[in-house]
Amino acid sequence: MPAYAVWFGINFLMPDFTKVALVTGAGSGIGRTVALGLLGAGYQVVLAGRRTEALQETVAMAATSKASALPVPTDITDPAAVRALFSQTEQAFGRLDLLFNNAGVGIPSAELEDVTAEQWQRVVQTNLSGPFFCTQEAFRLMKRQTPQGGRIINNGSISAHVPRPNSAPYTATKHAVTGLTRSTSLDGRKYNIACGQIDIGNAATEMAMRIAEGVPQADGSIRPEPLIDPSIVADAVLYMASLPLNANVQFMTVMATKMPFIGRG
């Protein structure tokens, strides 16, 4: 009989063998919630992020055996650090079945011409270069492991579709992530590597709580927007991850029903 795990009321088919996932940005927000969801579904999970204490807090929140969670403090903008992260993953668990490229940053709302070079580079390095470096290492590991293959899920954001006012760095990098997702999906086919993207609307995380208080709209007004619980995002990622490798959710958008997305921009 197949085994099932229950996460926020949804049943997910447990893998026939213990699968290994790596989540970036696992110390808070979406990354933390997804990492806990994967642990609850029976995965062994490598938790990557800049802050050691935050990663340890995530592990402490897990209801499963702490032996299934490996926190690895990592700066994903540093290729050498990313190589070390994937090396530790292979040494600890022997393989990698799922990479969730989640880590991302933004900057305060700013007129396009006022964005500094340092701000631009920080967003580009974290939101685009970091996922690319992680994808490279995931490819290398997934290609050589037995059985070959795995799945990569990129966190694209609603901003991969349409911008908010005064958000050029974040919007540009999230559009670029869509290109990375498509290229990864194409280049991974022959190695049984699937790649999809989840584009998330406003979720109730520390990074996005200001949205509930009011943010600039395309018409120049400032209005609050609805948020969804991060557990809804975790459920969506778990569904994408639960598919066999011969099936793939290429793009999924999840957001509050009343979020001003259609018609925005």
PLM ranges: what are they?
Residues 27-29:
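Conserved glycine-rich cofactor-binding loop
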Residues 41-57:
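Conserved glycine-rich Rossmann-like NAD(P)H-binding loop of the short-chain dehydrogenase/reductase
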Residues 73-85, 117:
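The beta1-alpha1 cofactor-binding region of Rossmann-like NAD(H)/NADP(H)-dependent oxidoreductases
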Residues 110-112, 119-121:
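Substrate-binding pocket helix/loop in short-chain dehydrogenase/reductase
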Residues 135, 173:
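Active-site helix of classical SDR
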Residues 157:
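Residue(s) in the substrate-gating loop at a strand-loop-helix junction
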Residues 197-198, 216-262:
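C-terminal helical subdomain
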